Amino acid sequence: MDGPDEQFMRRALELAHRGRQEGEVPVGAVVVVDGHVIGEGWNRPIAAHDPTAHAEIQALRAAAAALGNYRLTGAMLYVTLEPCDMCLGAMFHARIARVVYGATDPKKQVLKSQVKIEGGVLAAECGELLSEFFAAKR
């Protein structure tokens, strides 16, 4: 008999199959709180014309809408493929407590060398704007 991790991963796999039927890369994800699925998603970048429409993002958006809050503190996310950095960043901001994935993504390390990242341009002005914003909020 399957435990909870296997049960939720099986649901994510069902969603991945749905993505495959739609011609998308077959990845599915579910967000779980207190043993209940509150958000589901499958890859939709092609259909949505949206490079951020990964299964994890779709599931996070659905879960946030269900709770009326982008903070999903204590939630768990199950996904059929190891999350990319964008999705991990979204999970961090959503305060996901635990991520369980199925297959390892062999392209994950390759992608890190594809984008040149530079920082520090107008750093003082950018930092000042953020400091002023958060000072006014507190």
Question: Predicted regions span which residues?
Answer:
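A short, polar/charged loop-to-alpha-helix boundary motif
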Residues: A47-I57
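Small-residue (primarily alanine) positions within well-ordered alpha-helices
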Residues: A12, A16-G19, A29, A55, ...
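Immediate flanking context of iron-sulfur cluster ligation sites
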Residues: N69-L81
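Short, basic and Ser/Thr-rich N-terminal targeting/leader segments
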Residues: G23-V27, T73
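Short beta-strand scaffold segments in enzyme catalytic cores
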Residues: V27-G35
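Short beta->alpha transition motifs characteristic of CBS
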Residues: I38-P45, Q114-V115
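A short, polar/acidic, helix/strand-boundary loop motif
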Residues: D2, P45-I46
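Zinc-dependent deaminase
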Residues: M1-E22, M86-R138
